[in-house]
Curated annotation (Swiss-Prot):
The modification Asymmetric dimethylarginine is found at R382, R404. Residues 12-19 are annotated as: Interaction with host AP3D1. A lipid is attached at G2 (N-myristoyl glycine). GO terms for cellular component: host cell nucleus; host cell plasma membrane; host multivesicular body; membrane; viral nucleocapsid; virion membrane. It comes from the Viruses. This is Gag polyprotein.
Length: 495
């Protein structure tokens, strides 16, 4: 520990131990914080001996600062410790860690301003086609072959995909109409697309002439003429006129106007080269959500719509056209979820790991339900029990403490029990079952009588014996043949 604690000594160590960890807090820096910082530097593959000097602390700060946004709490604590130690080495008094960080930010801002001022003093930037020479005159600097080569390479590799438009905008920054025409003329193939671009430029030039008519009369001395549509397109204007328009006071940005026309035509070409509609972009069953989002926004860039419409497409169609697994997750996030939250939530959906996890969760729910049912914790619909003796709920009649009710528990009448009660027990004819054990009225009361004449009336059959004749006479004395007593018990014709 001795070697690690040798970072500070004497008066510097006393100043170190007077600095508070937090504004208004009681805890202060101690020697153990320097020991911890040395160990952390070794863990981050940095030399702990850098803590002993001002320049060493500055190098550590320069290494750790870019990682603060995504770093851990240990990394931030190490940065705060080194920043505080940086001011102790310079014998500059700070009260707490926050004051040390504020002073460090002020110092970095002053250094950055000096650097920018030094670059400005060296001369005008050479990144734009129109530059100022040593005599103070605005002159034109032609596009470099490197810029033209980059543009041609983009067209050859990407054809007219949506990313061509921002690439063209970046390469033509500050260009004159003559420079823009040079870039368009370097495109060898895709002549059909270039003809479409020329038609769009001619339409916009005609619209410009209609909105900006020529002033009547001669041009006053010392003034330049107003540019026409063909002048903006670079066909009827010279390079010097274009520079004059772009550098006059107030300036007429003919280069930016022409660039806007070209981008409008490129949008139409991109739309033609990307025939897929945003409505047709759907996520496959096993397609990762990240790849689906890439395809979605690639086609969205080619859509000819305002930014508000594109935002609506992103909020609605991105969720609607996802596969069922991702759509369930995205709807659970709500409508205010960011794209980062969506991609984080759907990461790994559709793969074998996700399917195994879903299956495990389903099996876990089934197992938990079975365990709860076995333990008697299943909360189903409880059956309400009611006492037939007192009429109250919560107990049965055999457990009732009230006096025993006489008679039937169902209808309240005496003379029969509840099992023999006919209350609300009617047959399908609407009549109650009789209390006696007779058959209901819709059943046969007795064996039906045959209505056919006797066999001897036809002159064939067995010989009639005296006993058989006596039996037939007894049957003739029975009820009339037209009686309905065989079917219904109370026949009015039999009375």
């Amino acid at each position: 520990m001795g070697a690690r604690a040798s970072v500070l000594s004497g008066g510097k160590l006393d100043k170190w131990e007077k600095i508070q960890l937090r504004p208004g807090g009681k805890k202060k820096y101690r020697l153990k914080h320097l020991v911890w910082a040395s160990r952390e530097l070794e863990r981050f593959a940095l030399n702990p001996n850098l803590l002993e000097t001002v320049e060493g602390c500055r190098q550590i700060i320069r290494q750790l600062q870019p990682s603060l946004q995504t770093g851990s709490e240990e990394l931030r604590s190490l940065f705060n410790t080194v920043a505080t130690l940086y001011w102790v080495h310079q014998s500059i008094q700070v009260r707490d860690t926050k004051e040390a960080l504020d002073k460090l930010e002020e110092e970095q801002n002053r250094t950055q301003q000096k650097t920018q001022q030094g670059k400005a003093d060296k001369g005008v930037s050479q990144n734009y086609p129109i530059v100022q020479n040593l005599q103070g005159q605005m002159v034109h600097q032609a596009l470099s072959p490197r810029t033209l080569n980059a543009w041609v390479k983009v067209i050859e590799e990407k054809a007219f995909s949506p990313e061509v438009i921002p690439m063209f905008s970046a390469l033509s920054e500050g260009a004159t109409p003559q420079d823009l025409n040079t870039m368009l003329n370097t495109v060898g193939g895709h002549q059909a697309a270039m003809q479409m671009l020329k038609d769009t430029i001619n339409e916009e030039a005609a619209e410009w002439d209609r909105m900006h008519p020529v002033q009547a009369g001669p041009i006053p001395p010392g003034q330049i003429r107003e540019p026409r549509g063909s002048d903006i397109a670079g066909t009827t204007s010279t390079l010097q006129e274009q520079i004059t328009w772009m550098t006059s006071n107030p300036p007429i940005p003919v280069g930016e106007i022409y660039k806007r026309w070209i981008i409008l035509g490129l949008n139409k070409i991109v739309r033609m080269y990307s025939p897929v509609s945003i409505l047709d972009i759907r996520q496959g069953p096993k397609e990762p959500f990240r790849d689906y989002v890439d395809r979605f926004f690639r086609v969205l860039r080619a859509e000819q719509a305002t930014q508000e419409v594109k935002n609506w497409m992103t909020e609605t169609l991105l969720v609607q056209n996802a596969n069922p697994d991702c759509r369930t997750i995205l709807k659970a996030l709500g409508s205010g979820a960011t794209l980062e939250e969506m991609m984080t939530a759907c990461q790994g959906v559709g793969g074998p790991g996700h399917k195994a996890r879903v299956l495990a969760e389903a099996m876990s729910q089934v197992t938990n339900s079975a365990v709860m049912m076995q333990r008697g914790n299943f909360k189903g619909q409880r059956r309400i029990i009611k006492c037939f003796n007192c009429g109250k709920e919560g107990h049965l009649a055999r457990n009732c403490r009230a006096p025993r009710k006489k008679g039937c528990w169902k209808c309240g009448k005496e003379g029969h029990q509840m099992k023999d009660c006919s209350e609300r027990q009617a047959n399908f004819l609407g009549k109650f079952w009789p209390l006696n054990k007779e058959r209901p009225g819709n059943f046969l009361q007795n064996r039906p009588e045959p209505t056919a004449p006797p066999a001897e009336s036809f002159g064939f059959g067995e010989k009639i014996t005296p006993s058989l004749r006596q039996e037939m006479k007894d049957q003739e004395q029975g009820p009339p043949l037209t009686s309905l007593k065989s079917l219904f018990g109370s026949d009015p014709l039999s009375q």
